[in-house]
Amino acid sequence: MSAVTQAVAALRMRAPYENWRPPVIGVSLLVPVGADCLAVADLRGMLMLPGGGAYERQRPEDAAHRVLSGPPGGLRLLRRVAVDWVQTRRRKVITHVLATAPMTREAVGHLIYRDPRATVRVLPTVRVIDGLPTQGRLRVLVGLQALATGETAYIEGGVVLPSAPPNLTQEWWGQRRGGGGRAGWAAAG
């Protein structure tokens, strides 16, 4: 191996193995139904918050309207209640948790989920929390608390942060520049 090849290999071994690719950005919807229930997607027994990916330069709020469609008058989004991200080997996976206005059971009956294999169900909040995987459970608990307090919560790698991290960039808010990539599955759960 030549000296140049060895030098390049040594640099690659020391370089951080992260953010080689643009982040995957997704949305999860927190849909309150009445005072004690949530609407969830049920994919053959696996419960999850309704979610989907955001396309290049698409705002999370716009992506949310592709996740659930069909309610009379459209889906009324209140605000972003949480931003959850994890650093994988090559990119960040960022999920925006958006809360909708409270819905009635009748209105939820008109919702159509983007994945035809899943059905939208209304379940008691406690049952939803028990039935979700760990990451989804954290998003629901923190999202509900943030909705109640009027704050936005920040979750990094499964840890709730006390405040917004100083390095938030526009790409985190769905305003990515350059670099392609299709929508990801960041929002599942």
State the predicted function of each range.
Residues M1-S28:
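Acidic, metal-coordinating catalytic segment for phosphate/diphosphate chemistry
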Residues M13-Y17, P23, V40, D84, ...:
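Residue-level detector of functional hotspots within protein domains
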Residues L30-P32:
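Short hydrophobic alpha-helical segments used for membrane anchoring or interfacial signaling
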Residues D36-L38:
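Entry beta-strands of beta-propeller and related beta-repeat scaffolds
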Residues A41-G45:
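C-terminal lobe/hinge of AMP-binding adenylation domains
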Residues L47, Y113-G189:
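Nudix hydrolase/Nudix homology domain
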Residues M48-G52:
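A short gly/proline-enriched turn/hairpin at secondary-structure junctions
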Residues A54-L77, D84-R137:
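Unchanged
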